[in-house]
Amino acid sequence: MLRTLLKSKIHRATVTDCELHYEGSCAIDEDLLDAANLLENEQIHIWNINNGERFVTYAIRGERGTGIISVNGSAARRAAVGDLIIIAAFAQVPEAQLDGFKPQLVFVDANNRVQHQRSHIPVQAAAHPQEGRPS
């Protein structure tokens, strides 16, 4: 059996451009593609933190070192310059390979420069444990 797992994530990237009349896709700075282990033409999910929009497109190379994140084509209607987004990709992993599988998580600053990277998501604690719930 194959399991679909998070493979790559660029967290809180800032949209720098929206090009409605460009071919569809999302241009991503090549430094970020490399850091997140994303390939040109790879399917990506984009989740817009500002407006809640979620959509699927594919990655294309953006100029290295520029911080470009350009949402293109019809998807440009779902984002605006300055919006914060999460870019994610998934992989189908055979169960026999699950133990060694780790996602590549990339965290960026306001200029879309890599700040740090991780290969795990920490356990989320309850913000306000409810009284009376069993432990």
Curated annotation (Swiss-Prot):
Its main location: cytoplasm. It catalyses: L-aspartate + H(+) = beta-alanine + CO2. The modification Pyruvic acid (Ser) is found at S25. Is synthesized initially as an inactive proenzyme, which is activated by self-cleavage at a specific serine bond to produce a beta-subunit with a hydroxyl group at its C-terminus and an alpha-subunit with a pyruvoyl group at its N-terminus. Its EC number is 4.1.1.11. One of its GO terms (molecular function) is aspartate 1-decarboxylase activity. Keywords: Autocatalytic cleavage, Cytoplasm, Decarboxylase, Lyase, Pantothenate biosynthesis, Pyruvate, Schiff base, Zymogen. Binds 1 pyruvoyl group covalently per subunit. Pfam families: Asp_decarbox. Its cofactor is pyruvate. The keyword Lyase applies. The active site is at S25, Y58. InterPro entries: Asp_de-COase-like_dom_sf, Asp_decarbox. Pathway: Cofactor biosynthesis; (R)-pantothenate biosynthesis; beta-alanine from L-aspartate: step 1/1. Substrate binds at T57, G73, S74, A75. GO terms for biological process: alanine biosynthetic process; pantothenate biosynthetic process. GO terms for cellular component: cytosol. Heterooctamer of four alpha and four beta subunits. PANTHER family: ASPARTATE 1-DECARBOXYLASE. Catalyzes the pyruvoyl-dependent decarboxylation of aspartate to produce beta-alanine. NCBIfam families: panD (TIGR00223). Belongs to the PanD family. This is Aspartate 1-decarboxylase. The gene is panD.
